[in-house]
Amino acid sequence: MFITLIFLSYINIVLSNNYWARLNETITLNSNITNDTNNELGIFWNSYNNTYYNNTFNNIAICGKKGIFCECNINYNTSISNTSISNTSIYNVTNNCSLTIFLYDDNIFKTYQLVYQNYKINYTINLLLPVTSPNITYNCTNSLITCEKNDGTNTNMFLSINNITINHTNQDILTYYWNNSEFNNFTATCMINNTLNSANTTKVINCTNPLLNSYQNYFLENIHTLFYIIIFIVSGLIASIFISIITFLSLRKRKKHVEEIESPPPESNEEEQCQHDDTTSIHEPSPREPLLPKPYSRYQYNTPIYYMRPSTQPLNPFPLPNPCPPPKPCPPPKPCPPPKPCPPPKPCPPPKPCPPPKPCPPPKPCSSPESYSPPKPLPSIPLLPNIPPLSTQNISLIHVDRII
């Protein structure tokens, strides 16, 4: 110790020591100072104060040592307010100038400093707490095991796989990547301990099919979400089928209605046939009647031609037309479908520019007027010699409507 102090004084470094202690425990900070009996040595015990950002050391005791004797003057209030331990002092100095501390409160766990001559030694006292069982997690996709500390101080953590220690640390978290090719189904144990107690956690890890395992975990964690998705899909399918059926029936009914409107009524053919029979019976002559020659075509003059028939020929009565059946009452009109909305008018294209007007050709000279010739007289048609005069005949006019 003496050699260490000489070395520290030479390089000007402060020596630091860490102590772990429980609550209500007494700890002694040993000074280990030796000096000659002829020389007196001054010793100072200080405590670190970090209240209100005032990082300074407060003096606890001032001691003088000569040989093996030590006499101190304690400047710190050593009384304890708790009645159960009121007779116990917080700080005491032994005969060799070592400091004894009773750790009755959390505020006592701090840093203390020993100063003598040109030497400084820091003693840091930490509160030692018991440990609890750690947490162990794993990720099959990354082949990762994680051990995490819950409570406890001054701890050591160990990881064992199949009762074989694989890794250890004194930090709060321990991680380890295992080899997939060696094992995927094993038992992992995380153990944590300190000088007070120890605890462990064991978990069976099965990663034979990491992809399937991850899908199973996702399914179990999101089972309620998948249930709502299935209900939504089934409801959508039922609604789509219902809408399709309604649309099909509506289109079928509309098509049938349009066909009934466009198809002609069955009575129209009979009426047209009846009218056609009447017309032919009136205008077409009987086949027994003799046909007289027609000198000119009907289309030439566009006028009806009448012929005379002698009274010696018997008149053939024309057959009367068949009476038409009474018309059937028309069915009530069916309501028309609502008109479709007209599409919006398309914008008119811009007008094309007119081409420039072409120059007019020069006027042609007028031809000389043709001479007028009088019309030729119509040829005289001789009458038949056997026809008596008009005054002695019973003449009837026949309207001939046949085209020669």
Curated annotation (Swiss-Prot):
GO terms for cellular component: host cell Golgi apparatus; host cell membrane; membrane; virion membrane. It is found in: Host membrane; Virion membrane; Host Golgi apparatus. Disulfide bonds join C140-C207, C147-C190. Residues 247-404 are cytoplasmic. It comes from the Viruses. Residues 273-287 have a biased composition (Basic and acidic residues). Residues 322-363 are annotated as: 7 X 6 AA tandem repeats of [KN]-P-C-P-P-P. Residues 260-295, 357-390 are annotated as: Disordered. Residues 1-16 form the signal peptide. Glycans are attached at N24, N87, N92, N96, N122, N139, N167, N193, N200, N206. Sequence repeats lie at residues 322-327, 328-333, 334-339, 340-345, 346-351, 352-357, 358-363. The chain crosses the membrane at residues 226-246. Induction: Expressed in the late phase of the viral replicative cycle. Residues 17-225 are extracellular. The keyword Membrane applies. SUPFAM superfamilies: Immunoglobulin (SSF48726). Keywords: Disulfide bond, Glycoprotein, Host Golgi apparatus, Host membrane, Late protein, Membrane, Receptor, Repeat, Signal, Transmembrane, Transmembrane helix, Virion. Residues 357-388 have a biased composition (Pro residues). Belongs to the asfivirus CD2 homolog protein family. Both glycosylated and nonglycosylated forms interact (via C-terminus) with the host AP-1 complex. May play an immunosuppressive role by inhibiting lymphocyte proliferation and subsequently facilitating viral replication and generalization of infection. Responsible for viral hemadsorption, which may help viral spread. Increases virus replication in the tick vector at the step of virus uptake or replication in the tick gut. May play a role in the host Golgi reorganization to yield viral factories. May play a role in host cell penetration. The C-terminus contains repetitive amino-acids that may function as a cell-penetrating peptide. This is CD2 homolog. It comes from African swine fever virus (isolate Tick/South Africa/Pretoriuskop Pr4/1996) (ASFV).
